Amino acid sequence: MKQKIIAASLLGALMLTGCSTAETTLESSSDTTQAILVPSDSVVTTESSESETEATTEATTEITDPDMSDVPVEQLGALLIVGDTAYEYYNFVLKTADKYITTVNRAGEVLKGKADVYAMIIPTSMDITLPASVRDTITNVSDQKKAIDYMYSSINGVKKIELFDVLKSHRNEYIYYRNDHHWTSLGAWYAYQQFAALRGNGSASLENDFTKVEYDGFRGTFYNDSQKNPALNNPDTVVAYKPNCTNHIDIIQANGEPLDWSIITNVSDWRADSKYNTFIGGDNPWSVIKNPNKNDGSACLIIKDSFGNAFTPFLVPDYQYVYVLDFRYYKKISSDKLSAVVAKNNIKDVIICTNISATRNSGLIDALSEFCQ
């Protein structure tokens, strides 16, 4: 892929700031004081060839931001609470971002001629759904689009799934939860459409291939992290799409025990903070979904953090086998690396699916790097 990168000012500013080791938990960032900010005046552009097309979807309607003049805004640690919605701060960390780049490039090299590798960095809600009138007043966070552009611009031999502009064009829709850090199924569906367009062989239809279910009363990570702030006491609804071809998933748990489970589980009676676990049984080292309507040997592997949970069900109609690997926990059950997993299972598509906060967490990227060999 031929690329043009106007990044001297970006890297210069990054190096002057220094490389922070500010860490996050498994998913959410909690330290915003020492991480590196991507300067707002930096420019990173890319050009794509036919062999490495970056799929995009154009907005079909003009999107306007709501009037936020009377909406209360409160900063609470690493969270910004705006009305009844919380947003997570993100800060770019150069050293960790560069290791992510190296890791993804190595995955492409290891699987060259054997499988297609896709990189998917998922932005968080702050730079997507937070109205510009509020977002523009926040100076101690990084520009997620520029951070993603920086990482994608240095990835070669891997297909990059562009999500930022697409999600931004749908920002007035219910694509992120209000009181949890994850995206919703609708946000994940728009990501699936981008992947399918890039792959050139996706055919799933939301109306024909899935059954919609809803589970009310979800109070997620932001609600808990805010010490149950009253402003967030407005539960989300978890909307899920159950594949019509099968709702069965075979899971290997972290203790090595197998579990027959559902791709979409009825969580109506589950605890309020557990309802995101409707998707693929939550976070497990290894899972396999077999589509009984396919007999062509097609197989994909999704290497994911928890954002991949809501995305995975949309892959099911397109493949005979969908293999799900959580890179944070896989080594608990196996010492196999990426090349061995792909060879053993005749996998032809590999999706590396991470939310952007993971790309600033050295522990998570170390785990991803350890596997991608």
Predicted regions and their residues:
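Extracellular glycan-modifying ectodomains
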Residues: 14, 19-373
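Sec-dependent bacterial lipoprotein signal peptides
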Residues: 1-17
